[in-house]
Design a protein with these regions (language model features):
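Glycine- and Gly-Pro-enriched alpha-helical subdomains that act as flexible
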Residues: 118-151
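Phosphate-centric recognition/catalysis
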Residues: 46-49, 53-131
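Residues that form or immediately flank small-molecule/cofactor binding pockets and catalytic motifs
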Residues: 16, 30, 68-71
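Short, Gly/Pro- and small/polar-rich lid/capping loops
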Residues: 1-13
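RNA-interacting cores
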Residues: 13-16, 20
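Intrinsically disordered, low-complexity, positively charged segments
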Residues: 20-56
Length: 151
């Protein structure tokens, strides 16, 4: 993983995914809160997400976030879902721990603390996935199920 030093909001990229120029990805440095579930004011979280987008190269209006429930449900994200969960928790996609899309310009985001974030890319079909893999989801094979969905 390589740190991308941006003055206002550093982030990380995985070397292997960074070699795939047709997609964009990031891992937040945690310098600023991008979760509505913490103690940060919602207006500040939105500003932090917008700033991260400016630094990492995604549009906040195209960000999609799900309501993570530590399960194994997978949601296929469409263009109509763009912006769900970007500006508030109420608009998140319901009860899902993996997001998959082949829509260009959509940014999928999962939030983790002690769970594992998994990012996948299938060059053949042009699909990406972002997975929140907690112990229950891992035991229920959320990663394997997501890989199978990408095929």
């Amino acid at each position: 993983m390589k740190k991308i030093d941006r003055e206002t909001f550093p982030f990380y990229r995985f070397d292997r995914l960074a070699a795939c120029r047709e997609i964009n990805h990031f891992v937040s440095s945690g310098v600023k809160d991008i979760s509505f579930l913490g103690n940060e004011e919602p207006v500040r979280v939105v500003a932090n997400r917008r700033e991260l987008g400016e630094n990492a190269g995604f549009e906040l209006d195209r960000l999609v976030v799900g309501n993570q429930v530590h399960g194994a449900d997978i949601t296929v994200v469409t263009a109509e879902d763009a912006g769900r969960g970007a500006y508030d928790n109420e608009s998140r996609l319901p009860d899902t721990d993996a997001l998959v899309t082949d829509e260009a310009g959509i940014c999928l985001m999962v939030l983790t603390a002690d769970c594992v974030p998994v990012l996948l890319y299938d060059r053949k079909c042009g699909a990406i996935a972002a997975i929140h893999a907690g112990w229950k989801g891992t035991a229920a094979d959320i990663v394997g199920k997501t890989v199978n969905l990408l095929r």
